[in-house]
Amino acid sequence: MEYKKILEMMDFSKGLIPAIVQDDENGEVLMLAYMNEEALKRTVDTKRTWFWSRSRKSYWNKGETSGHFQYVKSIGIDCDGDTILIKVKQVGAACHTGNRSCFYRSFEFEDGGAK
């Protein structure tokens, strides 16, 4: 039932949708991956994140090989229905590099320029 309600609000007309994954406790953005309808269904059904790998052309469950699972706490849908925000309880690292977040490289701007 939950899946059907979510699907009614989604627009998969372009095939894949971006899925932003965020830590439910502290709001940190952990990663971005892509989902199709089946990946979203698996995510809702199992309460763990599933994605579609564009390079391998197959489904993958975050944590299946590493043990670094993402347990779904909530799913938000953007205004156009073509992007979702998944808030999770992250176990271990979210990034394949071993970093907690895939966004571990950043630039800070001061007075209009990067420092």
From Swiss-Prot:
Pfam families: PRA-CH
PANTHER family linked: HISTIDINE BIOSYNTHESIS BIFUNCTIONAL PROTEIN, HISTIDINE BIOSYNTHESIS BIFUNCTIONAL PROTEIN HIS7
Keyword Thylakoid part of the UniProt annotation: no
HAMAP family linked to this entry: HisI
Pathway noted in the entry: Amino-acid biosynthesis; L-histidine biosynthesis; L-histidine from 5-phospho-alpha-D-ribose 1-diphosphate: step 3/9
Location(s), subcellular: Cytoplasm
Cofactor note: Binds 1 Mg(2+) ion per subunit.
Gene Ontology biological-process annotations: L-histidine biosynthetic process
Positions with a binding annotation for Mg(2+): D78, D80, D82
Top-level EC class as recorded in UniProt: hydrolase
Keywords, alphabetical: Amino-acid biosynthesis, Cytoplasm, Histidine biosynthesis, Hydrolase, Magnesium, Metal-binding, Zinc
UniProt subunit comment: Homodimer.
Catalyzed chemical reaction(s): 1-(5-phospho-beta-D-ribosyl)-5'-AMP + H2O = 1-(5-phospho-beta-D-ribosyl)-5-[(5-phospho-beta-D-ribosylamino)methylideneamino]imidazole-4-carboxamide
Gene3D superfamilies according to UniProt: Phosphoribosyl-AMP cyclohydrolase (3.10.20.810)
One GO cellular component term noted in the UniProt record for this chain: cytoplasm
GO molecular function, one term: phosphoribosyl-AMP cyclohydrolase activity
Family membership noted in the UniProt record: Belongs to the PRA-CH family.
EC number, UniProt record: 3.5.4.19
Protein's name according to its UniProt entry: Phosphoribosyl-AMP cyclohydrolase
Cofactor: Mg(2+); Zn(2+)
Protein species of origin: Clostridium acetobutylicum (strain ATCC 824 / DSM 792 / JCM 1419 / IAM 19013 / LMG 5710 / NBRC 13948 / NRRL B-527 / VKM B-1787 / 2291 / W)
Protein task: Catalyzes the hydrolysis of the adenine ring of phosphoribosyl-AMP.
InterPro entries: PRA-CH, PRib_AMP_CycHydrolase_dom, PRib_AMP_CycHydrolase_sf
Binding-site positions, Zn(2+): C79, C95, C102
